């Protein structure tokens, strides 16, 4: 018994998808938009972190190198009346 070879089924318009070329402008725009949004989100997170707690962390680190935390930002504080210059090298 011979097997009948069926003719190929026709491809309808809604079944066929044109292959996308990786170098097309659509791919380039998609990459550009993805990178741009990624950078905006990264800058936003960095700004928010600086605003919320990094600024204070930097001041505390500077305070450890200098005198005390209360005296940060006020410039050179004068010596105390009892002559105690706490935190100054002798």
From Swiss-Prot:
Pfam family, one: Gemini_mov
Membrane-crossing residue ranges in chain numbering: 32-52
Keyword hit for Membrane: yes
Keyword Transmembrane helix attached: yes
Main location: host cell
GO biological process: transport of virus in host, cell to cell
Topology in the lipid bilayer: Single-pass membrane protein
One cellular component term from this protein's GO annotations in UniProt: host cell membrane
Subcellular compartments: Host membrane
Keywords for this protein: Host membrane, Membrane, Transmembrane, Transmembrane helix, Transport, Viral movement protein
InterPro entries the UniProt entry points to: Gemini_mov
Family recorded in the similarity comment: Belongs to the mastrevirus movement protein family.
Function per UniProt: Involved in the viral transport within, and between cells.
Assembly and binders: Interacts with the capsid protein (CP). Part of a MP-CP-viral DNA complex.
Name of the molecule in the record: Movement protein
Organism: Wheat dwarf virus (isolate Sweden)
Taxonomic placement: Viruses, Monodnaviria, Shotokuvirae, Cressdnaviricota, Repensiviricetes
């Amino acid at each position: 018994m011979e097997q009948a070879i069926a003719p190929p089924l026709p491809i309808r318009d809604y079944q066929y998808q044109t292959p996308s070329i990786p170098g097309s402008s659509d791919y380039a725009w998609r990459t550009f938009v993805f990178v741009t949004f990624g950078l905006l989100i990264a800058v936003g997170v960095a700004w928010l972190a600086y605003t919320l707690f990094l600024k204070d962390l930097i001041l505390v680190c500077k305070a450890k190198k200098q005198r005390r935390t209360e005296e940060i930002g006020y410039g050179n504080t004068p010596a105390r009346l009892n002559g105690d210059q706490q935190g100054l090298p002798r």
